[in-house]
Regions:
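N-terminal beta1-alpha1 ligand-phosphate binding loop
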Residues: 4-32
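A structural preference for short, hydrophobic beta-strand core positions in alpha/beta folds
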Residues: 37-40, 146
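Glycine-rich phosphate/pyrophosphate-binding loop and the adjoining helix
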Residues: 26, 31, 69, 143-194
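Helix-loop-strand module that forms the ligand-binding subsite of alpha/beta enzymes
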Residues: 58-149
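N-terminal beta-loop-helix "entrance" segment that forms/cooperates
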Residues: 41-61, 156-161
Length: 194
């Protein structure tokens, strides 16, 4: 089986700034023979977790939306990159609700799978939003993949993001780092390391 990474676009804009950053990462992963998928959350509301615990019993959320569609893909995926625009120094409400529900009852699915956060912002609040996403990985036994700088791009539209040379280089490095770590883990498994 070919290794796979899902890049989650947590922006209500399908092809905006967050997508532009994720697409740059995706290109590097594909150059490294990693299968990819950009999973867009869409532009319809995603309800927050109500803590009912039904997912612990059934394996899926009772709310039938993008959460269950995504959870079906998790077992056959090796790494995840969650991307979000910065809204008031935080992730988009949509991504926050999505991640709460994804990780609430199904955290064990992510154990030892790679995780990384990416944010796009016009000016500020990026590191706070990155920290928010990374907390899900830290509590789920997920190694976090980093880059040469914080995983952020700056711009108010995709054209401005493409002009953020340092940000785009950070995305390329992140893609290469994710591919390298996936290949290292695969080599370790082949050598008998469990």
């Amino acid at each position: 089986r070919k290794m796979k990474v899902i890049l989650i676009n947590g922006s209500p804009k399908e092809k905006g700034c967050t997508y532009t950053a994720l697409r740059e990462i995706e290109k590097q992963l594909q150059k490294n023979n990693i299968e990819t998928e950009i999973f867009w959350l869409g532009n319809k509301p995603i309800s927050g977790c109500i803590g009912c615990g039904s997912c612990l019993k059934t394996g899926e959320c009772f709310m039938q939306d993008k959460v269950n569609e995504f959870l079906e893909k998790v077992p056959k995926t090796d790494g995840f990159i969650f991307g979000s625009p910065v809204h008031f120094a935080a992730t988009s409400g949509m991504l926050s609700s999505f991640m709460d529900r994804v990780f609430y009852g199904r955290r064990k699915l992510f154990s030892n799978k790679l995780g990384s956060a990416v944010v796009s912002c016009r000016r500020g609040g990026a590191t706070a939003a990155l920290d928010e996403i990374n907390k899900y990985f830290g509590i789920s036994n997920m190694p976090i993949v980093s880059s040469q700088y914080w995983n952020m791009v700056h711009g108010n539209n995709p054209e401005e993001v493409l002009k953020d040379e340092e940000g785009m280089q950070t995305m390329r490095t992140l893609g290469n780092n994710m591919a390298w770590l996936l290949k290292s883990i695969e080599a370790g498994k082949k050598a008998g390391i469990k």
